[in-house]
Amino acid sequence: MTDSKPSVSVIIPTYNCETYIAETINSVLNQTFKDVELIIVDDGSTDRTRQIVASYGGDVRLLTQLYSGVCVARNHGIREAAGQYICLMDHDDYWFPDKLALQVDEMKRRPETGLVYSTFLWWFPDTHGVFPPPESFTGHMGEIGIDEEFSGWIYHLLLLDCWVLTSAALIRAEVFDKCGVFDESLPYSEDWDLWLRISREYPFIKLKRPLTLYRQHPNQGNRLARAIDYRTELLTKAASKWGLCSPDGRCLTRARFKKNMARYHMEFGLKNLVAGNVELANRSFLKSWITSPARVKNLAYIPAALLGWRPKW
């Protein structure tokens, strides 16, 4: 890698995000760490997103493609990236100014690390749909330091939940050569799938300080009912392939894994029950009980659903 190449490549896939894309771009350009290339991959936007990005001129490299989905757009950016480290940022999130500086410093101090991530803050709109300014969160920044519990070899912990927010991560570029990129066949949980693969080959570091704002919308996709439970499919596949232990020997007990899977089956069932998919919901409630028979209460949802009960969310 020559000196002319950037230290960090920031890749932002975007689609119809004219309302928020400028704030996201500005948060990257305002980083205290300046050795950065910013790549925006426009995934066939039909609003003014592309024009807004183009207005930044040489500060941003704009790539365009026909609408293909976020995984394809991210992988497009990864192929074009020249940096030693790569960040993948969602088009409506926000970085605090020291995000890259703190993460790059940690990467340099720990060359064996494949991924550095941080805590993040949920960013909700008020009752009028207005998001509070990022400056209003400065009182919630907390201490600088490493969260040891969620650092190191964390594969076994990733079998419980997707602890890594995509926008909050910094990844060593060589990781993609060894572990692959985003699985374009997955419509959901594609980030979790990648983190699981990386966690088999590299230790992670988690910084305690929140460095990213994660913007939330009322109809956000991760809250909607789906026909397939991608979470349980992903975790079942991972456990079957790699077991329940991290490379350093730390393990998740089978009982805890099953209890967690039962919880996911139940959550999937409740989402589908709210959406009116009673048959699918009841199958999920039954799977939850079969996975963890101690959760007898999950069986009670089946007759309740048939009698017309719905959770009030």
Predicted regions and their residues:
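N-proximal low-complexity "stem/linker" segments adjacent to membrane-targeting elements
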Residues: 1-29
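Acidic helix N-cap motif at the loop->helix transition within catalytic regions
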Residues: 19-22, 45-55, 94, 98
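A conserved acidic beta->alpha catalytic loop
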Residues: 27, 34, 42-51, 67-68, ...
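Glycine-rich, basic loop-to-helix element that forms the pyrophosphate-binding segment
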Residues: 65-81, 91, 102, 153
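Conserved nucleotide-sugar donor-binding catalytic segment
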Residues: 79, 118, 137-233
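Conserved donor NDP-sugar-binding/catalytic core segment of glycosyltransferases
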Residues: 98-137
